[in-house]
């Protein structure tokens, strides 16, 4: 018997965030980063380690990239949030995932694409095209991994995410799991987005990237910025009183040529 986690789902919604825009603006916030907005699987027991169903309320376990996550609200509420934020001079940055789907969705995604002869095109990686331990060609946490080296798969993923941006005038995308997808896929994604909005920006999550290592993703027509993982160490040193170490680290970062790109200063507004 499967028990339901109590509570089984955490998180706010579009309407609640809309109500807090003035509060956030008073704090000096000019860009709001929100979770992936697409429909997610309702529960997961893939590891068989518990009889309690767990929920991907974080948004990273997509079940359908064409539908909105019902827990976040309806499309009218999402549009209202964007319109209200824009009216206050604020931007909305939506988290997106192109690397993987939610647990148990292999059959669904493998049924979507066909070639010119009517043969099925598998969107999800199997043992025939997996390289164990490889960042790009193996699954992350056993999640169904998209075969993004296949152009047909990339084109479909890019189309889904571009349609969301175009329909709702989303300002920016925060891109998940950058290191697990080919640079050619990110280039195709950026090209598609900038055809709709030439000023559209993407900030990537590349685990381990920092001021001294941009992983080759900056200045290549893909990511406009990367999350600065080095800052985690700076912050820990600061709160533990190691101020001299923080000063030295910040000085090195300030002197680095790509410093303004690595930690996303381009998203600051005048």
Predicted regions and their residues:
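Substrate-binding/active-site clefts of carbohydrate-active enzymes
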Residues: 1-168, 188-197, 201, 212-213, ...
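Active-site-proximal helices and loops of the catalytic beta/alpha 8
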Residues: 86, 90, 159-267
């Amino acid at each position: 018997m499967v028990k339901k986690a109590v509570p089984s789902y955490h998180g706010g919604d579009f309407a609640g965030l809309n109500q807090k825009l003035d509060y956030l603006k008073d704090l000096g916030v000019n860009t709001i980063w929100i979770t992936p907005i697409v429909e997610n699987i309702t529960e997961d027991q893939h590891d068989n380690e518990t009889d309690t169903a767990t929920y991907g309320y974080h948004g990273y376990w997509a079940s359908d990239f064409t539908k909105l996550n019902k827990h976040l609200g309806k499309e009218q509420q999402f549009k209202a949030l964007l319109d209200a934020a824009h009216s206050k001079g604020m931007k909305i940055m939506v988290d997106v995932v192109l690397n993987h789907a939610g647990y148990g969705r292999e059959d669904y995604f493998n049924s979507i694409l066909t070639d010119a002869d009517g043969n099925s095109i598998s969107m999800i990686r199997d043992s025939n095209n997996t390289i164990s331990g490889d960042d790009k060609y193996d699954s992350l946490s056993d999640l169904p991994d998209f075969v993004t080296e296949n152009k047909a798969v990339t084109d479909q993923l890019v189309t889904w995410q571009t349609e969301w941006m175009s329909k709702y005038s989303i300002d920016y995308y925060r891109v998940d799991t950058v290191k697990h997808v080919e640079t050619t896929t990110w280039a195709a994604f950026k090209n598609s987005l900038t055809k709709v909005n030439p000023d559209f920006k993407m900030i990537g999550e590349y685990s381990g990237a920092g001021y001294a290592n941009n992983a080759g993703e900056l200045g290549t027509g893909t990511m406009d910025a990367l999350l600065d993982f080095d800052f985690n160490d700076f912050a820990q040193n600061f709160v533990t009183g190691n101020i001299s170490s923080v000063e030295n680290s910040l000085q090195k970062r300030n002197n680095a040529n790509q410093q303004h790109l690595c930690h996303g200063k381009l998203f600051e507004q005048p």
